[in-house]
């Protein structure tokens, strides 16, 4: 999947660099031709890093910087294409593609609800909190926000504020976890869970599923009891 996504992303990059526009949901890639180094964030507090628009911009800029820098080095290399794809720039292309897909996940999720008419408008704020947690945790993970420091978009000390913002977002969401989890009606026969059914019959449910498995429908070879069971019992 990463290979296919990387090749498609490369095609989009080539298209943008030729002066052509790409459409939804890839429109953010049109900024590849702009000066990313000139963009600055004025975020200097925990509340600033809870601004969902700023977080969306941060995810986009991280992906743009990684794509721009990786493809510039890729095109400057004199190695054969296969060597560049499978060896020299393999990990760099995986990293840029992952950043691209993470942004698309965030963007498409937010697009799916921000203009939706909910019976209770308070749901939007809870989904915004989910989006904040997704974005902040991904930027903080393994310091993957390094591309944003590289462009100068984030100021020194931003990582500390991001960690505090993530803690606050998780604390805000915690009381809403059960309502969010139960907001969709998922019958037991549709979405089986290893933690049991809606009545909490965990072991009974697991036993029923195990008894219905196709492995129990075949005839057991006669040598299983004679040769295999002694070994299994010894290990037990």
What do the predicted segments below correspond to?
Residues 1-236:
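Flavin-dependent oxidoreductase catalytic core characteristic
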């Amino acid at each position: 999947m990463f290979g296919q996504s990387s090749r498609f992303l490369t095609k989009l990059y080539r298209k943008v660099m030729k002066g052509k526009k790409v459409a939804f949901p890839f429109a953010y890639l049109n900024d590849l031709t702009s000066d990313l180094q000139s963009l600055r964030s004025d975020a200097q507090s925990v509340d600033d890093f809870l601004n969902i628009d700023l977080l969306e911009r941060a995810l986009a800029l991280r992906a743009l910087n990684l794509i721009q820098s990786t493809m510039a080095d890729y095109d400057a290399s004199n190695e054969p294409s296969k060597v560049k794809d499978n060896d020299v720039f393999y990990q760099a292309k995986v990293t840029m593609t992952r950043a691209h897909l993470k942004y698309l996940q965030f963007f498409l999720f937010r697009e799916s609800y921000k203009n939706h008419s909910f019976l209770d408008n308070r749901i939007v704020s809870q989904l915004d909190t989910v989006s904040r947690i997704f974005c902040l945790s991904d930027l903080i993970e393994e310091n993957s926000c390094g591309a944003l420091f590289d462009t100068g978009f984030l100021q020194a000390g931003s990582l500390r504020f991001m960690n505090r913002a993530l803690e606050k977002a998780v604390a805000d969401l915690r009381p809403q976890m059960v309502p969010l989890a139960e907001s969709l009606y998922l019958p037991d026969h549709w979405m089986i869970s290893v933690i049991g059914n809606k009545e909490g019959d965990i072991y009974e449910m697991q036993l029923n599923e195990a008894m219905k498995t196709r492995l129990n429908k075949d005839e057991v070879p006669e040598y299983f009891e004679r040769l295999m069971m002694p070994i299994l019992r010894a290990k037990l």
